[in-house]
From Swiss-Prot:
This is Dermonecrotic toxin SdSicTox-betaIIB1biii. The keyword Lyase applies. GO terms for biological process: killing of cells of another organism; lipid catabolic process. Keywords: Cytolysis, Dermonecrotic toxin, Disulfide bond, Hemolysis, Lipid degradation, Lipid metabolism, Lyase, Magnesium, Metal-binding, Secreted, Toxin. It is found in: Secreted. One of its GO terms (cellular component) is extracellular region. Belongs to the arthropod phospholipase D family. Class II subfamily. The lineage of its organism: Eukaryota, Metazoa, Ecdysozoa, Arthropoda, Chelicerata. It comes from Sicarius cf. damarensis (strain GJB-2008) (Six-eyed sand spider). SUPFAM superfamilies: PLC-like phosphodiesterases. Dermonecrotic toxins cleave the phosphodiester linkage between the phosphate and headgroup of certain phospholipids (sphingolipid and lysolipid substrates), forming an alcohol (often choline) and a cyclic phosphate. This toxin acts on sphingomyelin (SM). It may also act on ceramide phosphoethanolamine (CPE), lysophosphatidylcholine (LPC) and lysophosphatidylethanolamine (LPE), but not on lysophosphatidylserine (LPS), and lysophosphatidylglycerol (LPG). It acts by transphosphatidylation, releasing exclusively cyclic phosphate products as second products. Expressed by the venom gland. GO terms for molecular function: lyase activity; metal ion binding; phosphoric diester hydrolase activity; toxin activity. Its main location: secreted. Its cofactor is Mg(2+).
Length: 274
């Protein structure tokens, strides 16, 4: 999976897909009451990027619904995964439950259209810190209460704050989540990051019977040397400001026979068995 990073303006969706991304990540900003308002990262952000692009969240969902719906004029077959980077660290943890309710309802109304949409992308909920786990509980409660619990099959969980992996496992255990879990490891493209935690996540992913990590991705990679390093370690995905660079690396002799771009037929919740 090649995730286009910080795709917050509607016009950026096609831009990143044209560069080769098959997944996009966008930032969801909340008001003080936990209501999702806009897709917006803000300052600071990655080096070489404009941090201020934005869109109304519901308008973003309406557009992406079209882009991921077969036979729609806007349909782009390659876009199979949406990563929602939830900026919960900007609001009180006490509002995390309200935020989860709101995002679930907006997805129901604007993306899935309560069963009337054929939009098919998988959705990854990126939670910044384990202290905000009530967002996940609220999201699942809302799908159940609204009568659309089946959409859980399309939704995965990912904690992005580089926290202790055992601590993350404990929270997932509290929530009763034993599947559909991704694990991110990374840092802004402005800085270098070692591989110790990334290797630990990959080791846990590959441990038989360990159900708290199904996929691992590294972020935010812009240098080809770091992309190569991550691929050699065996990551499932790369988040990048430059998907075209990832495409070029994947075509290199070392990787061409080992990796390919994920398609809709690849289940993002299953561990890869090479």
């Amino acid at each position: 999976w090649i995730m286009g990073h910080m795709v917050n303006a509607i016009e950026q969706v096609d831009e990143f897909l044209n560069l080769g991304a098959n997944a996009i990540e966008f930032d969801i900003d909340f008001d003080k009451d936990g209501i999702a308002q806009i897709t917006h990262h803000g300052i600071p952000c990655d080096c070489g990027r404009k941090c201020t692009k934005k869109a109304i969240f519901t308008e973003c969902l309406d557009n992406i619904r079209q882009v991921t719906t077969p036979d729609d004029p806007k349909f782009r077959e390659q876009l199979v995964l949406l990563a929602l980077d939830l900026k919960l660290q900007r609001i009180s943890s006490a509002k995390a439950y309200r935020a989860g309710e709101d995002v679930a309802k907006k997805l129901l109304d604007h993306y899935w259209q309560r069963g009337n949409s054929r939009a098919r992308a998988y959705i990854l909920l990126n939670i910044p810190l384990v202290e905000d786990y009530e967002f996940i509980r609220a999201f699942k409660d809302t799908l159940k209460n609204e009568g659309y619990e089946s959409y859980n099959d399309k939704v995965g969980i990912n904690f992005t704050g580089n926290e202790d992996l055992d601590k993350i496992r404990d929270v997932l255990e509290i929530l009763g989540i034993h599947k559909q879990v991704w694990q991110a490891d990374g840092i802004t493209s402005c800085f270098a990051r070692g591989t110790e935690r990334l290797k630990e996540a990959l080791e846990k992913r590959d441990t038989p019977g360990y159900n708290y990590i199904n996929k691992v991705y590294a972020w935010t990679l812009v240098r080809k040397s770091i992309m190569r390093r991550s691929l050699r370690l065996g990551v499932d995905g790369v988040m990048s400001n430059n998907p075209d660079r990832v495409i070029k690396v994947l075509k290199e002799k070392e990787f061409a026979d080992k990796f390919r771009l994920a398609t809709y037929n690849d289940n993002p919740w299953e561990k890869f068995r090479g």
